[in-house]
Amino acid sequence: MVLYKNKKKQIINYANSNWGQNEGVEFQETMLQCILEAVIVSKDAKQVLSLLHELKLFENFLWQRVNTEMSLNHINLTCMLLLYKSKYEYITWDLIDENRFQLFFEKVIEVSLSLNLSEVVYMIQFITLCFQFSNIEKLRKLVYQLTNISILNSLDNLDKVKYLLHDSSSLTKAFDSYKEKRPSIVEKFPLHNLLSRWIHSLLIKSISYAQTEKQEAKVTPLLAIINMSLVLLSAFPTRRFAHPVIEDSCFYTALRMSLYYDSNELFKKMTDDLNYVLKFPFDNTRGNEYEKEQKIRNDELVYYHLQLTLFSDFQKELGDLVFCTQTSLQQRQKLEEITSFLSFNSLKSLCSKCYLRTSFPEKYAIKVDFEFLKNVFINTYDRTRLVNDYDEIINFTLKDVLGERSVMDQENSLTNYFLLQNTAIQYLSISFFMRQQSKAYKKLLLRSLYAELLNFSEQYRRLSIKNATKNLTKDNFFSLNNFKVTSVAPPQIGQVLPQFVKCQMGLSRPGPFHSALRDLKNSIKSPFLCLIYISKDMEYKLLHGNALDPLEGVTDFTIATICNDDVGMFQSDMQSDSDNKSINVYLSPFYYHSLAGLGEYRPKQLKFNFALVLSPEANKYWLDLNILVSLLNRAKEFPKWFEDLFLGFGTPDICAFPNAGLNSIYARNLFNTVEQLQSVLPNCHVPSNLSTESLLIKFYTNQNKISADVTASDRHFLLPSNRLYTYNDKQLESILRGSQPGLTMVNGPTRCGKHVLVCKLLEVLQDTSPNDRTVVLSDSNFSMNTLFTLLEKARCFHQGHLLYLSDEGKDETLERYGTLSSWISKLPGLLREIGRLAASIQAPGSHDASPDTALYFRDAYIKRLWEKYLNTVDDKDSVDAYNRFPFHSYFGDKSKRPIETYNKDNFFDYATKLYGELEYMFQQLEEIRPFGLLRYYEDQELYALCQQSRIIGCTWTSLSTRLGTLKEKGFCFNNLIVMNSQNISESSITSILLSNCEPTGFDRLVLLGNQYLTSGNQDINNTSNGSLFKRLRYLKSRIIDLNTQYNVRESISSLCSSIYPLDIKTVDSSPNKRLDYGNSGFAHEVQFINVGAFKGSQETEPVSGYKQNLGEAEYAVALFQYMRMLGYPTNEIVICTLYESQVSLLNEIISVRCSHNSFFGQPAFVGTVEKLPSDKRVNFVIFTTVESKEASDHWNPKTFYKAFSACSYGLYVLCNRDLFRSTRGLEKLWNEIEKTPDKLLLTTGEIYPSSHKIGSSVETFEIENLLHLSNYVVEMTKKRLNTN
């Protein structure tokens, strides 16, 4: 820490001297050397790089001096800062000068060839970064020429190139074409020779480096080489040529690393990743997975190669063993026999000749020994283990958990390397992506399990000392009396694992355990348990604290699933006084199989003596992991157009309108005028005097232009379309494109009408394809509630075809439109109408008793009366049609407009509409009827999901718990609409798409998001599993940008536009024109307020990263109280901040000052900006920034944009205004900040909602400080009390 403080002071002095720009070259070089040493020596490189980023070393010095004479220190520091900025998205590639970047790129290539590997680590990482961002044009041109020339030239030097390429005609053609054109390329391109040696030279250097360097501090260069190789093996288009060049040398480098360093799990992870990429069965030119038959043929070739190698090179040592069959070579016993006859050198030679690709043991020997090579050889060719690799993903042992702990510990020693890495944005195949995400979730789960086991061990020790009893009880774990296996289902054909293992475990004093399971049942459908065994000889150590490791007492564990019936039993029998109760669980088949082995032994009694209820976080990881694994075998069921886009092949426009297909659509009340129609569809043919109420639009292409024939629609729709909203041109374009097959991406800020857009798109899809099923996905219930409120207002959707899967539970959603409970609750009202209808025609009997009797009444009476009416009415335009209508009595009482007021001469058309209402009522009864036959709510929901519903709205959380069951029951859909897609991970969307059982696949994918909002999804932030919206945007997919915000003040919109260059116009669509008036009691709608010191101090930081600002917290609560005194509703006010520690302080103050006072209440949200729901609509935001001395990483454009864009009418920022001048990305805010005073300015005589008109003169007064504001609020409260 002292070292960092000294270096920090020195770096700040350099910055104050303008980075020595007025000094000589020698001073500048010394300065760069000092700064570079500070980064390398520091234990937290991120902290130093963050300081350099804040001081603008890159912008003010390094980048300005990029030239051909740059020093090594200059190059390394530039690479470091580019890596840092890209990691934390502080860089805008479009703003970097292309010529200067090309000069720097070529200089890095040149220098990295001439220096040792240890000196060019950051240069290699910089080039790797360029590979990963090859979607950016200026990077793509440089990357393509480097990879194509370097890899193709390396292929020319390989003896085995013909053998490697003979199965791929496209690779052979590309290689031959390069050989022909190389002389002309060399002549025209001077850098050809430099680029052609680059990759091959680095790989050779890595092999040489691995053989000579033996210090752990030198491991980073090898890791950099392997990471670069992994990116080259996965990034399109480099992957089509990379394998033949990279695989041997790269794998050898990893092998040498693993042999030199003992027990390092990071090396095992790295070699396993590399092994997986190299061994994965796919066609390099396309990324398509091999068919099962082709995999079998390839497997046969592997054993043929082994058999040939043994016969040709090892006949002398093995004798008659070389004549064994390929089948016998796949047996472990035969492999053991072969290795026993080989010497160490012979076995080493055999492993080398066979190009082995396998995982390594967890502990690596210091030197290569015979047992190590023997294990490598046998594990490669042993085929007695028939467990599929995707099943092995969910196999957990205690060794895995402890191994992950080792990785966590050792990652800290390699912080510099891991902080500066990005993730590749392209994948080899769909299943490769699924496996990669499975590994990421497994990593998160293992870390969560480790934390829970650690917590359990500590609680166990404390309770044991306190209670001194065997029946230990805690809310999250419970002791077991016994644990026995009750039934084992035999394996399926071709498998070795049991289908399931059902066990019974006896609980001691099950009260708290029931409570924990009940809470867990409310959050997920299938609660999971961690079964633990603590041996007797370890209890003493744990009780007396003699264990060296807190987990030393836990000697075995596995994960089990509680049977659903038992969970229901828990909830109904929680108050039981029984001392013992047994419950059933499903044990992990992997664990049981490992106990039983390959023999006949099948244990009946197991040793587990504790059951640990997993936390909701661990349950979520386990559930998501199981979903990913269960969908691996469906990885080929994507439509071809989306598979190509997902993997990064071809032009993204191929997947969009009109290339993905053209459909005719029905559009009702979509366009306001014919002129708007012609502006959105400039090449359309519109007949004269066309009404836009109901249109049929037929699209076609004419000379590469999209044209359309627009005619009035004469189609009869069951429900009318109401014109509730008007749509701007961008919204109309989104609706028209979204109704066509393929991908549609819509980007826009908050309050730009995305919910209204989706509502209208659903109506168009319903009218155009009534039988299509659409899933609408979002990241929050708030977003879904908003959408279904709009659907209810539209009144053009049949409620029986809507389904809202809410996370709020059955009881809470009884009255919510679209939920199953709400739909079923309509039954009594419909039956009452049936009773009234039967009475109006004097039909005897209780026809309103049930849906069955009502449907019988329809067939026996209503249909016959209508058929009789049709047959007896001769002239449909006469009064006779009115006189003979059989339902006068019913509609005379029911209709808002008396039936007698209609024109009797033209009554038949109206009679048809009235009968249509009766048919619709019976249709609803017919669709509700099946739910009465299903006993359980879960079965009713499953029926609605898989059979009846046409529009399904849900969050990923609510759908993920049902996904496994839905896949088995044939859940299918045609369209997927994802709202707030920047917050939903790729694996979530992929899982939903793969669970689709529609034979033709899905037709449309519509992604709506806001590219400037940071994701609140921690799974996206913690893993490489980013959002699909963001990745497709990187791949240059076409995006429609919405540019109109509704009911947002122009001053707030200007703040957002000053952070990001948004061309946004604001529209006031409120009925009372609220934007014309200010906020009651405030002189300004937006104000940045200098709070200043409170009690002599500003923010405090007792622990690093734990910052609090008492003055700002008190000011924020006082401002909230002031607004409440004026009558502002609590649900319109939000208090947000940058630090979780400040949230605790705010909650504490609110609890004391507001919670128990009916005058105040609590704000709608108190929390960090990161946790603020991106779609939460609030009118007023109080934002406390905490820091007043210097800005930290929290002061970044995305965080402030999210806070500003969350409000509509009022924004009050508590801050130190001067910090905005010096914070990168926020400097442009200063022009907006200066427009308002630095002290809070209030008005008098205004009570919410009445207010002054903006621009008019109003009496104001200034709040001097926090004490002044607090006293003013106290006086207002006293007056209010006296008034009451």
UniProtKB/Swiss-Prot annotation:
Highest rank taxon of the organism: Eukaryota
Cellular compartments annotated: Nucleus
GO BP terms in the entry: mRNA cis splicing, via spliceosome
Gene Ontology MF: a single term: mRNA binding
GO CC terms of this entry: catalytic step 2 spliceosome; post-mRNA release spliceosomal complex; Prp19 complex; spliceosomal complex; U2-type spliceosomal complex
Alphabetical UniProt keywords: mRNA processing, mRNA splicing, Nucleus
Tagged with keyword Nucleus: yes
Principal place of residence: nucleus
InterPro entries: Aquarius_N, CWF11_fam, DNA2/NAM7-like, DNA2/NAM7-like_C, P-loop_NTPase, SF1_C_Upf1
Subunit description: Belongs to the 40S cdc5-associated complex (or cwf complex), a spliceosome sub-complex reminiscent of a late-stage spliceosome composed of the U2, U5 and U6 snRNAs and at least brr2, cdc5, cwf2/prp3, cwf3/syf1, cwf4/syf3, cwf5/ecm2, spp42/cwf6, cwf7/spf27, cwf8, cwf9, cwf10, cwf11, cwf12, prp45/cwf13, cwf14, cwf15, cwf16, cwf17, cwf18, cwf19, cwf20, cwf21, cwf22, cwf23, cwf24, cwf25, cwf26, cyp7/cwf27, cwf28, cwf29/ist3, lea1, msl1, prp5/cwf1, prp10, prp12/sap130, prp17, prp22, sap61, sap62, sap114, sap145, slu7, smb1, smd1, smd3, smf1, smg1 and syf2.
Job description of the protein: Involved in mRNA splicing where it associates with cdc5 and the other cwf proteins as part of the spliceosome.
Family of the protein in this entry: Belongs to the CWF11 family.
Protein name stated in the entry: Pre-mRNA-splicing factor cwf11
Source organism per UniProt: Schizosaccharomyces pombe (strain 972 / ATCC 24843) (Fission yeast)
